[in-house]
Amino acid sequence: MDLGTTKYIIYTELIADGYVEKHDVIGAIFGQTEGLLSNELDLRDLQKSGRIGRIDVDLENINGKSFAKITLPSSLDKVETSILAATLETIDRVGPCFATVKITEVEDIRVSKRQYITNRARSILRKLMDEMIDTYEITEEIKESLRTEEIMEFGPENLPCGPNVVHSDSIIVVEGRADVLNLLRCGIKNTVAVEGTSVPKSIMDLTKKKTTTAFTDGDRGGELILKELLQTCDIDYVARAPYGKEVEGTSKKEIMKCLRAKVPVEQIVGNTCNDTCNVSKVIENRPEEIVEPITHKYYEKVETPVTEPVFEDEIVEEETVIVEPVKKTETEIIDVDATNEIQADKKFSGVKEIVDSIKNTGNVKFVVDGTEKTNTFKEFLTNIHEIKKMDFFAADMPISQKIVDLLYDKTPIIVGKEIHVTKKPVNLRLFSFDEIVA
């Protein structure tokens, strides 16, 4: 059915008591409605002028009766269409047979069109949004291409580096090209990569002339490269990516945090007693979110000006800071009468045995409801939210202020390899291993 300019469709059902044919039904519609209404609503005139469409009749003859479904398109307004529909119900004979006619529905075809328009518009919009390139993506794509163009080459080995490496007073040494690119994304342009575990001679010479920060991955590979750098280059500061992460996969916020937390190389060497820099053990015992940055046991925390990374075209002048060793002093934080108190107080019974059991293991041991439990420090931090109260806590590691702040309301006693805190809650007892075994 060609709807054309149709506004409404009248659906009608007709039942005749005898056998009739389609032309009988059409004749009855035109014949019995003729003259009922004014000439403006005469079906023949309306059809000639195109204001109503072709009348469709779907006829069936069953058991001596005839059943017809009649469809009449109308482009009249709703009032005239309603009058026309009511007129059809006045038909009472078709041919020689009695008949009844009933209007089943008058459909506003424009509603269907509006629904189609709505659904189709949704589909088109969804397709457009899927195909549309976001402005942010365009911006990032352009920035990425510019950053890639900014990567330069340094030395006869053609090492990837940032554009400010030659002119800056300070440099950051990383592992590979991807690390240089990630730091460029963060606006850090004084970076150069060693491209492997064998440090090129041009890097060795460059580190002698500039203040150098070694920034390596937080895994075993990063530790090996750091060892190589410390043995072959003149490194001033050391920074590590978060534990288990690579520099190339670290976010801008984490990179800035790591670079600001860099430590002088003297502290790294001191921590390992001038050994081949066993940094992994230090890092494993120092989760970033809890423990203070690495400090040598013969050094107090010293505020030192550190070099910020160079951003964009900015070149920062730096001074080499020498960390002087200072003598460890007794403070009121540590209980002076620790040995006598431990021997006198029953709640400290068994402490020496617990301390002996975790010495040189890097583990922690704590007592909950009379039950002793042993974990690595990392496992302990993971499950700490499940622990409400502890009778006792001991760790084969230095006790920092952050550990005290974390545990002061969970246990009355904390024992560690060393005590490095500035504030102690009144109801908390802090003991070092040396005091326990004295």
From Swiss-Prot:
Entry cofactors: Mg(2+)
Keywords: DNA replication, DNA-directed RNA polymerase, Magnesium, Metal-binding, Nucleotidyltransferase, Primosome, Transcription, Transferase
EC number, UniProt record: 2.7.7.101
Entry's Gene Ontology BP terms: DNA replication, synthesis of primer
Binding locations of Mg(2+) 2: D217, D219
Cofactor note: Binds two Mg(2+) per subunit.
Keyword Transferase attributed: yes
List of residues binding Mg(2+) 1: E175, D217
GO molecular function annotations of the record: DNA-directed RNA polymerase activity; metal ion binding; poly(A) binding
Swiss-Prot/TrEMBL catalytic activity: ssDNA + n NTP = ssDNA/pppN(pN)n-1 hybrid + (n-1) diphosphate
Nucleotidyltransferase found in the keyword field: yes
Any one Gene Ontology cellular component term annotated for this protein: DNA-directed RNA polymerase complex
Domain Toprim: 169-243
Function: RNA polymerase that catalyzes the synthesis of short RNA molecules used as primers for DNA polymerase during DNA replication.
Family membership: Belongs to the archaeal DnaG primase family.
Subunit text: Forms a ternary complex with MCM helicase and DNA.
HAMAP family found in the cross-reference section: DNA_primase_DnaG_arc
Protein name: DNA primase DnaG
